[in-house]
């Protein structure tokens, strides 16, 4: 019994670390598209922080407001204004754009395609989801981290960040197509009228044999 408790705890800790890296690395690589050669680390850290912010406030205040698309531009404007007072020479719109992009694409939309998100809170309080990426997969942050590392090493940070983002988008597209194929196959197998079949990813890697599960 102790072994199973320890294993479950280890799994929960892995999932937590994986989730942090999932958002932080994605936010960082998105924000780096806005970077300049002298401000690479500024935008890298800004993007990581922006993408983690919704979960920080959720854990501290048990509130879903910053998981909403509606709150995103206001949060970005607030933090961009604060950062502008510190980094006076940096254009406000560049800070705002990088923060907003990392916030939305590095967290809100990632949540939407893995475990769901109340993306229209407070007008729609239910979590919406289109699960095509398993919460346990490290593939997204591995791609992002590899692209960032290569960009820093070869001093082509924006180019290789764009390449990393394109690779992630191709992976998401592959997962979306795979989900549709599995869903169509299940509808052909279960020919009940108006059958509601929900397909969701379970594997850590897209090449695993048991990568999808479902409930009807």
What are these regions (language model features)?
Residues 2-199:
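N-terminal membrane-targeting hydrophobic helices
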Residues 196-216:
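Exposed beta-strand-loop-beta-strand "reactive/processing" segments of non-cytosolic proteins
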């Amino acid at each position: 019994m102790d072994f199973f408790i320890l294993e479950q705890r280890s799994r929960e800790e892995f999932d937590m670390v994986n989730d942090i890296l999932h958002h932080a690395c994605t936010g960082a690589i998105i924000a780096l598209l806005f970077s300049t050669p002298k401000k690479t680390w500024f935008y890298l850290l800004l993007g990581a922080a922006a993408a983690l912010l919704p979960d920080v406030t959720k854990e501290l205040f048990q509130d879903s407001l910053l998981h909403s698309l509606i709150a995103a531009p206001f949060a970005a404007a607030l933090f961009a204004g604060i950062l502008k007072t510190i980094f006076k020479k940096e254009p406000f719109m560049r800070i705002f754009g990088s923060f907003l992009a990392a916030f939305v694409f590095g967290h809100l939309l990632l949540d939407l395609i893995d475990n769901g998100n109340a993306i229209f809170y407070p007008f729609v309080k239910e979590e919406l989801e289109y699960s095509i990426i398993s919460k346990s997969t490290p593939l997204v942050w591995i791609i992002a981290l590899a692209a960032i590392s290569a960009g820093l090493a070869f001093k082509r940070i924006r180019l290789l960040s764009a390449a990393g983002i394109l690779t992630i988008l191709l992976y998401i597209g592959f997962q979306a197509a795979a989900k549709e194929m599995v869903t169509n196959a299940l509808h052909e197998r279960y020919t009940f009228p108006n059958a509601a079949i929900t397909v969701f990813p379970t594997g850590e890697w897209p090449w695993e044999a048991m990568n999808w599960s479902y409930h009807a």
